[in-house]
């Protein structure tokens, strides 16, 4: 059971990416906006990591690490990219669809993702919280820009 939780937590951002694409497929303006800005969100995270330069917690567990991914901006932990991505996806889909059951499922995946990143000491609680807040704020900005621009 613990391995399933870890895998959902690790791959949560990919799962939410595909869920969002499926649910947004009939709303092309929002779909393209999401598709473009999820990648902008990733680069925003890298830029913030290079500006803030806060190290990851000491003693993080490399058990779920694939290769040496911690180079460049990924050496730093603030803000958490996983947290920022899952909360961006969740907030964006909520703003477009406003489905409570879907929101609860996505928040569950967000929770598992945050837990997994904290459990293996990839990030501190503050790094995870800041990542989540940035993801939510950026999703709101993107949603309102797209809504205004494409007159939805």
Give the predicted meaning of each segment.
Residues 1-78, 84-119, 140:
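Hydrophobic alpha-helical bundle signature of multipass membrane enzymes
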Residues 1-3, 144-152:
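Short, Lys/Arg-enriched, disordered terminal segments
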Residues 82-86, 123-147:
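Alpha-helical transmembrane segments that form the membrane-embedded catalytic/substrate-binding core
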Residues 50-59, 123-129, 148-152:
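A cytosolic-side transmembrane-helix exit/cap motif
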